[in-house]
Amino acid sequence: DYSKGLKTLFESFNILFLKITTLIVKFIPLAVLCSMTSLVMLTGTETLLAIMSFFGTFVLALAVMLLAYCVLVFMIARLNPIILLKKHASAMMASFSLASSNAAMPFNIKSCHRLGISSRISSFSIPLGATVNMDGSCIYMAVAGLFLAKVFGVDMGGSELFSMVFSIIVLSIGAPGIPGAGLVCLSVLLTQIGVPAEALSLVMGIDSLLGMFRTAVNSAGDVAVSLIV
């Protein structure tokens, strides 16, 4: 009885924190609009051009990651990557629209079944991947961290880069699979590398869109690893 009560308590706290996080995320666009307007008025169109460059670099890095998944599937699983992308396309679209690794798990499991992966493997690998396989989040924090460090004139030496990589790995594994989690992890990373907190305003406006892209790539990674296993 005591263990059941404790379990219920922790589950209630988990639901409460998720609702609070979701509520905060809903009000972020308004704060971002005010912050971005002020920033553009102060710095001019150069800021918008820099953000567009950051977005392009991020999407290109995700495309390279997706290509790496396809190569691994072809070399190890001996499956045509086109078949993988074709059968997983609907799950990737669902992941893109949901922007949540946890919410996309049922779609990924169905995709595994279409690819002939046993339920015994997919029921273990997909939930595990939704927790620890955050390649998209790693890329996001790396690109955003370097971009913002450059914008604010923060020098990044070898030791700083090593510390940054280690922090990104830890933060990506510990990040919950919910919308907006990447932004919270990025704020922690920026604090560590010495970038001012106001730097977040540069990426807040497009974070939701970036979250969709990185979740779709995470989804492809989860299924690709399940296929290889």
Label the predicted regions.
Residues 94-172, 226:
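Helix-loop-helix junctions within the multi-pass membrane cores of secondary transporters/permeases
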